């Protein structure tokens, strides 16, 4: 990825101060998604390391991970697996509790979403502390997935999430980094 594209990509992400709470800068990718060339290029850059590789499924974390993950699944000719908040999937599910800044939450996946041994890429729009992605990787592994990578458009490196995922043995692909949280 060229430095020019990285700068263009950063410029296409809207910064919303003090959302969802004071002191937080929310990185809104809906502006990037609304720019066809930037969106297409971001997807191309995210999948580039796996071009020609066998990827069986792409798992996207609710909700923006669905948009990016669906586009990546299309690009690599794989299936898509939604990872949702508890109670949102209609069939028998497996769940995983994960840590939030204050407290815990649960995510779920259909018990039959993955055939054991399938190669899976995990996708979300942003990685901060890595709690949700860590929970999603554990959940996918619980149902037999081989998680071969985790992809995020945005990294907030000061919060350590990408390092946490790498420590789990999962390569991480991000496109741009922003300071702060």
From Swiss-Prot:
Query: Molecular function terms in GO for this entry?
Result: adenine binding; adenine phosphoribosyltransferase activity; AMP binding
**What GO CC terms are in its UniProt record?**
cytoplasm
Extract the InterPro entries matched here: Ade_phspho_trans, PRibTrfase_dom, PRTase-like, UPRTase/APRTase
What Gene3D superfamilies does the record point to?
3.40.50.2020
A Pfam match is: Pribosyltran
> For this UniProt entry, what is the primary localization, expressed as one broad class?
cytoplasm
Keywords for the protein's UniProt record, in alphabetical order = Cytoplasm, Glycosyltransferase, Purine salvage, Transferase
Q: According to the lineage, what is the superkingdom?
A: Bacteria
In which compartments does the protein localize? Cytoplasm
Per UniProt, the enzyme's principal EC class comes to transferase
Reactions catalysed according to its record: AMP + diphosphate = 5-phospho-alpha-D-ribose 1-diphosphate + adenine
Nuclease among the record's keywords? Answer: no
Q: What's its EC?
A: 2.4.2.7
Q: Which biological process, per GO, is one annotated for this protein? A: AMP salvage
Q: How does it assemble?
A: Homodimer.
Under the heading HAMAP family, the entry gives: Aden_phosphoribosyltr
**Which NCBIfam families does the record associate with it?**
apt, PRK02304.1-3, PRK02304.1-5
Q: What does this protein do?
A: Catalyzes a salvage reaction resulting in the formation of AMP, that is energically less costly than de novo synthesis.
Under which name does UniProt file this protein? Adenine phosphoribosyltransferase
Taxonomically, what lineage is the organism? Answer: Bacteria, Pseudomonadati, Pseudomonadota, Alphaproteobacteria, Hyphomicrobiales
């Amino acid at each position: 990825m060229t430095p020019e594209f990285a700068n263009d990509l950063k410029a296409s992400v809207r910064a919303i101060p003090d959302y969802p709470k004071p002191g937080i800068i929310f990185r809104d990718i809906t502006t990037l998604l609304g720019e066809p060339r930037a969106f297409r290029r971001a997807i191309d850059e995210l999948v580039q390391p796996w071009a020609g590789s066998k990827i069986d499924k792409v798992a996207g974390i609710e909700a923006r991970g669905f948009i990016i993950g669906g586009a990546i699944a299309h690009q690599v000719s794989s299936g898509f697996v939604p990872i949702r908040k508890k109670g949102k999937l209609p069939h028998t599910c497996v769940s995983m509790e994960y840590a939030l800044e204050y407290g815990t939450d649960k995510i779920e996946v259909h018990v039959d979403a993955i055939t054991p041994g399938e190669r899976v890429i995990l996708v979300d729009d942003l990685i901060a502390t890595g709690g949700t992605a860590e929970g999603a990787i554990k959940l996918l592994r619980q149902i037999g997935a081989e998680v071969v990578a985790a992809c995020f458009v945005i990294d907030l490196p000061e919060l350590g999430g990408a390092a946490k995922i790498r420590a789990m043995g999962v390569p991480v692909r991000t496109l741009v980094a922003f300071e702060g949280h």
